[in-house]
Amino acid sequence: MKTYLVDTADLRKNLANLIKRADGTPIWAVLKGNGYGLGLIPMAAVCREAGITRFAVTEVSDVRALREAGFEKEEVLMLRPTCAGDELRELLDLNAIITVSSQDDATVLNGVAAQKNVVANTHIKIDTGMGRYGFLPTEIDKLLPIYAYMDNIAVSGIYTHLHSAFCNKKQTYAQAE
């Protein structure tokens, strides 16, 4: 088995440079897959020490682990959409931001949130070419009912996944448009 050594001092320097270049724009640390194999909690701790307090994960168990490890005030976005009632209830209990990628997602979440008498904090996922999930750019009209008629959903953000950002600039620019 291979072992990786992460120089957290260098990581902190890199994060400081990233924060400086972001010039006040919020940064989300994507820590899916156990922090990409480097450890969810240790990587979240380094990010928090550097000033990054927004985390994105793909599993409910990761949201729970962050909360149990004391990351209670930090924003945690569940990147993977879900219509499973048990997952939605737990995400609401954990005060997670929940991804909405379709009208079905929104309808189910609105119902679960209404049953719990809470308003779900959500981010809308737009599919700009990854093909995994999300509203297509041509489906923007489907977002209006979420804002207009779903009283138990609050939309606080919108995001996409530029899957080839570092290796295919032409495709990335096309996705962004």
Residue ranges and their predicted role:
Residues 2-6, 10, 23-177:
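Active-site-proximal beta-alpha core segment in soluble small-molecule metabolic enzymes
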Residues 11-14, 18:
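Alpha-helical packing segments of well-folded alpha/beta enzyme cores
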